[in-house]
A protein has these predicted regions:
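Pre-Walker A adenine-sensing motif
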Residues: 2-16
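Hydrophobic anchor at the beta1->P-loop junction of P-loop NTPases
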Residues: 23
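Conserved lysine of the Walker
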Residues: 31
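Hydrophobic positions on the alpha1 helix immediately C-terminal to the Walker A/P-loop
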Residues: 34, 38
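Short glycine-rich substrate-engagement loop in P-loop NTPases that contacts/grips substrate
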Residues: 53-82
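Interdomain motor-coupling "hinge/lid" segment immediately C-terminal to the ATP-binding subdomain
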Residues: 119, 123-228
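Accessory nucleic acid-recognition modules appended to NTPase machines
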Residues: 182-341
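Catalytic cores of nucleic-acid endonucleases
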Residues: 324, 348-394
Length: 402
C-alpha cells in the first residue's frame, strides 16, 4: 500500500473518541485502502488483531444481510473486557446500518469506522441518524502531491510543471496510478468507475427509467466545467436540441449526481453584499479524467480542468469554496477555512496585456488583506503584482503556504 498520510493522520486524531468516524467520497477514491492503513496504524500502537473487526459489505458474502443479523454478528464478535475497533466498508449496502452503529456505540466499548459512496453518506443525511455522534472525512482522488508519490513507485517523475499535464489528463483515481497505463487504458478504467456510479449509485438506487435523459444532463455538466449555469440553462439547451426536460427534473438529476460524489456544487458569493447567491452556480467534477473518459480528450478544455484541479485541492485542504462576484467581475475561487481566506484566479495562459490587467484588477478591487493569487500554467507564472502572488498551477498545488 502507498501511504496517504494526510487522511490517515487526520483520522487518527479521533481514535477512541466517542464518535463514529465516517469516510465518504466517490467510488474508488481510496476509502477502503485508507481503512486498511488505519488498521495497520492501530496494530503499530499495540492493538491486537483479535480486537479489530473488518468487514467489506460490497462482497457477495454479505449479500442480503439484514441490520438485525449485522447487529448480532458484531455483538458476538465484540470483546467483553476491552475496546473493540470495528471497520465497516461500504456500509450503506446494509439497510438500517445506522441503528446498528448507534446501538453499539451506546451499549458497547467500541470505536467504529465506516465508509460509503452514495447519498446516504452525505453529511446532510448522516446528521439525521447519527445526530452529533460522528465526524466525517471526505476522501478525494489523489492530489497532485499524492500523484507524484504514486508515480515514484514505478518511474522517475519529471519536474512538477512537466508532470502537471499528465496529472490533469489522467486524473487522480489511485487505481490508474498503480502502474504505467496508457491514456486509453486509464480512460477505460475511469469510464468503468463512471458507469458504476451512474448505474449503481444513481439509476438503480433512484429507480430512474429514462437513463438517456440523465446522461444528457451529465454530458452538459461535464462539458461546462468552469461555466456558471442553472437547471433552467440545461432545460433550455435540451429543448433547443429537441430533447424536452423540465427544470425540476434537471435539478433533481444534478442533486443525485452531487449525492453520488460525481460532481461538486460551487455557489456564487457576492463579496459586496456578503451573501451566497442561489442562481447560476458552477459544478466541478470529482476528477478531471472523468471528463476525458466520458467525452474524449480535448486540449481546449485544459484551462477548465486546471480550474477543476485547483478547486479540488482547496476542498482537500478543508476550505469551503465559492465563486466570487464583484462589481469588477468574477473571482474564480473565494476559499474560506475558519478565520482564513484566500482569493484565486486561474488561467492556463495569459496572452494579452488587457487580459492580464483584467485578472489583476478583479483582485485589486477586493479591499482586504487576505492572500490573493493569480495562477497560470505558462512560462510567466511567477512574481508579485501589487501584493498579488503570481504562481504556476503546479507550484500552487504543492505549496504549503495556504
Amino acid at each position: 500500500m502507498i501511504e496517504r498520510p494526510t487522511y490517515v493522520n487526520a483520522i487518527l486524531r479521533f481514535v477512541d473518541a466517542p464518535l463514529v468516524k465516517v469516510l465518504t467520497g466517490i467510488r474508488r477514491s481510496g476509502k477502503s485502502t485508507i481503512l486498511l492503513m488505519l488498521i495497520e496504524a492501530l496494530k503499530r500502537r499495540g492493538i491486537p488483531s483479535e480486537r479489530i473487526l473488518n468487514y467489506r459489505f460490497d462482497s457477495m458474502r454479505y449479500d442480503g444481510l439484514t441490520a438485525n443479523a449485522l447487529y448480532e454478528m458484531l455483538l458476538a464478535a465484540v470483546a467483553r473486557d476491552q475496546k473493540t475497533y470495528i471497520f465497516l466498508d461500504e456500509v450503506q449496502e446494509i439497510a438500517g446500518w445506522e441503528k446498528v452503529v448507534n446501538s453499539l456505540m451506546q451499549d458497547e466499548d467500541v470505536d467504529i469506522y465506516v465508509t460509503g459512496s452514495n447519498s446516504r453518506m452525505m453529511a446532510s443525511e448522516i446528521s439525521t441518524y447519527l445526530t452529533g455522534r460522528y465526524v466525517s472525512f471526505e476522501v478525494f482522488p489523489l492530489s497532485f502531491a499524492e500523484y507524484l508519490t504514486f508515480k515514484r513507485q514505478y518511474a522517475i517523475p519529471q519536474s512538477p510543471r512537466a508532470e502537471l499535464a499528465q496529472y490533469i489528463r489522467l486524473g487522480g483515481f489511485p487505481v490508474v496510478h498503480l502502474q504505467p497505463y496508457t491514456s486509453d487504458d486509464a480512460y477505460t478504467i475511469v469510464h468503468d468507475i463512471y458507469n458504476t456510479v451512474i448505474f449503481t449509485d444513481i439509476v438503480r438506487r433512484n429507480e430512474i427509467r429514462k437513463v438517456d435523459q440523465l446522461e444528457r444532463v451529465v454530458k452538459y455538466t461535464f462539458s461546462n466545467v468552469g461555466n456558471t449555469f442553472s437547471a433552467a440553462t440545461i432545460s433550455k439547451y435540451l429543448k433547443s436540441e429537441h430533447r424536452s426536460l423540465d427544470e425540476e427534473t434537471v435539478y433533481a438529476y444534478l442533486e443525485k449526481l452531487e449525492k453520488a460524489f460525481l460532481i461538486h456544487r460551487c455557489s456564487r458569493y457576492d463579496l459586496k453584499g456578503k451573501e451566497l447567491l442561489k442562481t447560476q452556480e458552477k459544478f466541478y467534477l470529482a476528477d478531471p479524467a472523468l471528463r476525458y473518459a466520458v467525452l474524449g480528450y480535448d486540449p481546449d478544455t485544459v484551462a477548465a480542468m486546471l480550474e477543476n484541479a485547483v478547486y479540488l485541492e482547496l476542498r482537500r485542504r478543508g476550505y469551503a469554496v465559492s465563486v466570487g462576484k464583484t462589481p469588477a467581475g468574477e473571482i474564480n475561487f473565494v476559499a474560506t477555512r475558519q478565520n482564513d481566506r484566500l482569493y484565486v484566479q486561474v488561467a492556463e495562459k495569459i496572452e494579452q496585456a488587457s487580459t492580464e490587467k483584467r485578472e489583476f484588477d478583479r483582485l485589486l478591487d477586493i479591499r482586504d488583506n487576505y492572500p490573493k493569487y493569480v495562477l497560470r500554467a505558462d512560462d510567466f507564472a511567477h512574481g508579485n503584482h501589487e501584493g498579488i502572488i503570481v504562481m504556476h498551477v503546479a507550484d500552487f498545488l504543492l505549496s504549503d503556504a495556504y
